[in-house]
Amino acid sequence: MDLPLQEIELAAKRLAPTIHRTKLEKSTTFSNMTGGEIYLKYENQQKTGSFKIRGASNKIAALCERGEIKAAVASSAGNHAQGTAYAAKVHNIPAIIC
C-alpha cells in the first residue's frame, strides 16, 4: 500500500487540535539489545489512554470535512470505543458504542 506524504501531513493537521503530542524517548535498554537506536512513543499518555484515538479522530474528521457523517458507531469495549466516542464529541456528532 502506497501512502503519499501529503496524506500523512493532512492526517497530522486533522489530529493536531484533538490529540496530545506525546513524548518520544530513546530506550537505552532496547537500543543496546538491538544495536540500533530504539525510541518509545508514550501513547498511554494520550487523552484516551491509547493510540486508538488517532485512527478514529482522523477518520471522523475526514468524514466531517466532506459532510459524509451524521453519527459514529463503534463495536468495541476498549480503546477503540474510547477513541471513537472522544472524536465524536470533539466533532459534535452522536456516537453509538456497542
Regions found by a protein language model. Give the residues of each.
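PLP-dependent amino-acid enzyme catalytic core
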Residues: 1-98
